[in-house]
Amino acid sequence: MKLVDEAEILVTAGNGGNGCVGFRREKFIPLGGPDGGDGGAGGSVWIVADENVNTLVDFRHERTFKAQRGENGMGRQAYGKGGEDRIIVVPVGTVVINVQTDEVIGDLTRHGDRLLVAKGGKGGLGNMHFKSSVNRAPRQATTGEEGEERLLKLELKLLADVGLLGFPNAGKSTLIRAVSSATPKVADYPFTTLYPNLGVVSVEAYRSFVIADVPGLIEGAADGAGLGTQFLRHLQRTRLLLHLVDISPALGVYGEGGVDGVSPADQVRTIERELERHDPELLKKPRWLVLNKADLMFEDEARAAAESIVAELGWTAPWYLVSALGRDGTFPIMKDVMAFFDRQREDELDARNAG
């Protein structure tokens, strides 16, 4: 299924029912007092996260959501029935934004998370509330309040532990196929990946993590070149980034206005510049360098090229030389990633215990 990760919807809560003007009409009580009941409250609109939903595609067909209006009050102090709430189901990882204010209303990161996005109006008061010593037969009641209305933007941010960065054709999709059961499209031309892909990497029994492959970046992506940076939001929740670089000398032309024959070190610098322009927080995440396509060179040449790239960059974080296509060197990376997460959990536990 095609991933749709943005949608705009209009939500409208139900109005409250009106209060009733009524009087007791019983035998032998000719001057019965007021008995008009209150109107029912309008229904509210809720957004609920469901782990069984994977995309926002349904919102391309239905963009308006209304809750039920409250019923009017009636005589004999009968209250109107409250309107039914409207429930909107979204994938886990959805961020809800108020379009008018650009404020983030909520971030639904767990199955079953609920968010009130439009509150129903209160019911109006019946005339029984307006009886006084000077007004024994009030003909006054109030109308119900209007329900809230909001224009909302829904943004889906995939929940992945590891994110893959790199130029188009760096081999990100090949790597995710090699280490997980995901089957993204793989071909020898740029921008094969048009939408994010998720894969689950199992290192040992009951020990796994989720890895995300997003479309590649090129120079000028922050200005919309190539596929732009619209998919980078899916890397914001990751705990580790793997930066893939094609070290083979036969570099292709990466799209109109793209890069022709850029050195591997300059590929890394270009991605870093685009991240700095679009989302500097991503640069603060732990990032490991994965030098891919070693199978296109002799082993000694590949090792020498990798060491030269690392030296040119002054790279101090972990780095790896792999062939994603041949799966050479991919499993050690995944083992190291799992060990990295284990250390993170231990550090977090120690910090909580110390506090």
From Swiss-Prot:
Subcellular location field: Cytoplasm
Residue ranges occupied by any OBG-type G domain in the UniProt entry: 160-342
Residues binding Mg(2+): S173, T193
Pfam families xref list: GTP1_OBG, MMR_HSR1
PROSITE patterns for the chain: G_OBG (PS51710), GTP1_OBG (PS00905), OBG (PS51883)
Annotated keywords: Cytoplasm, GTP-binding, Hydrolase, Magnesium, Metal-binding, Nucleotide-binding
Entry's family note: Belongs to the TRAFAC class OBG-HflX-like GTPase superfamily. OBG GTPase family.
PANTHER family, per the entry: DEVELOPMENTALLY REGULATED GTP-BINDING PROTEIN-RELATED (PTHR11702), MITOCHONDRIAL RIBOSOME-ASSOCIATED GTPASE 2 (PTHR11702:SF31)
Entry protein name: GTPase Obg
Organism: Xanthomonas euvesicatoria pv. vesicatoria (strain 85-10) (Xanthomonas campestris pv. vesicatoria)
Gene: obg
